[in-house]
């Protein structure tokens, strides 16, 4: 949840007993281009752990290349965002727009999982639209 799940929010959650927190979504392409603001989203303090770092993108190679950069921050797991419905995300083919292409979703998950030393999870929606529920594909 961009702009919500920052460090202070995660610390509040863990202080109230949350068993796992998540970073704001991090652009794999931003990491590809070594964007400092993107990298800053991955900073995790000991009080926020266990913490997952959530990445998004639509290119398997760039998503896989993001993993070593993500691992510099030692997350307990990596979450792939394939569920964000925000227009600025889906208009680039990222987030929930990937629900229209289950084959590409599989390639992205495989690319990330193949290089990740920590568990990988995926955030999805039940489908791109109400008339096409394809989450089980």
Q: What do these predicted regions represent?
A:
Residues 12-15, 61-98, 102-137:
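Alpha/beta enzyme core
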Residues 1-76:
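Glycine-rich, positively charged N-terminal anion/phosphate-binding segment
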């Amino acid at each position: 949840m961009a702009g919500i799940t920052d460090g202070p929010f995660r610390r509040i959650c863990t202080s109230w007993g949350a068993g796992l927190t998540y970073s704001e979504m991090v652009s794999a392409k931003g990491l590809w281009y070594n964007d400092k603001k993107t990298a800053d989203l991955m900073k995790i303090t000991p009080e926020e752990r266990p913490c997952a770092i959530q990445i998004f993108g639509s290119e398997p190679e760039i998503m896989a290349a993001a993993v070593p950069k993500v691992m510099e921050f030692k997350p307990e797991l990596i979450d792939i965002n394939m569920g964000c419905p925000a227009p600025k995300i889906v208009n680039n083919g990222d987030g929930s727009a990937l629900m229209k292409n289950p084959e590409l979703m599989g390639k992205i998950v495989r690319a990330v999982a193949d290089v990740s030393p920590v568990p990988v999870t995926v955030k999805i929606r039940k489908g791109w639209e109400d008339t096409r529920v394809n989450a089980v594909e």
